[in-house]
Amino acid sequence: MITGIQITKAANDDLLNSIWLLDSEKNEARCVVATSGFEADQVIATSALGEYESRDVAIEKAPKVEGGQHLNVNVLQRDTLQDAVKHPEKYPQLTIRVSGYAVRFNSLTTEQQQDVIARTFTETL
């Protein structure tokens, strides 16, 4: 479980008023903000915080430990891709992003090419 705290008293002055996310399952602390001594997003063992007093800080949105979003950006026109399906010899160097990898459009099967076109160009969100 992840909880948020603000350190109100500590032997280490760098911890004073800093805000942390504590992961009790991993015994890790992630710095959200500190005035000095620690960087934002720095992860340390919870035990490295030493002895401290703190107050709870509400986490408005539950953090995602795993998962997330993935975005492929292709700056193309639908007409260009459709023409590349019909006339691959005109576009030997046409490269697109698929699942984070750069791939030559002509190396995809026709079905994969049509799928890329359908997913890349939509009428509405």
Swiss-Prot record:
Keywords, alphabetical: Organic radical
A GO term for molecular function: formate C-acetyltransferase activity
Keyword Repressor assigned: no
SUPFAM superfamilies: PFL-like glycyl radical enzymes
GO cellular component: cytosol
Gene3D superfamilies: 3.20.70.20
Presence of keyword Nucleus: no
Modified sites of kind Glycine radical: G100
A Pfam family it matches: Gly_radical
Domain Glycine radical: 5-125
Role noted for this protein: Acts as a radical domain for damaged PFL and possibly other radical proteins.
PANTHER family per the UniProt record, alphabetical: FORMATE ACETYLTRANSFERASE, FORMATE ACETYLTRANSFERASE 1
Protein name as it appears in the record: Autonomous glycyl radical cofactor
Source organism: Aliivibrio salmonicida (strain LFI1238) (Vibrio salmonicida (strain LFI1238))
Lineage, opening ranks: Bacteria, Pseudomonadati, Pseudomonadota, Gammaproteobacteria, Vibrionales
Designated gene of the protein: grcA
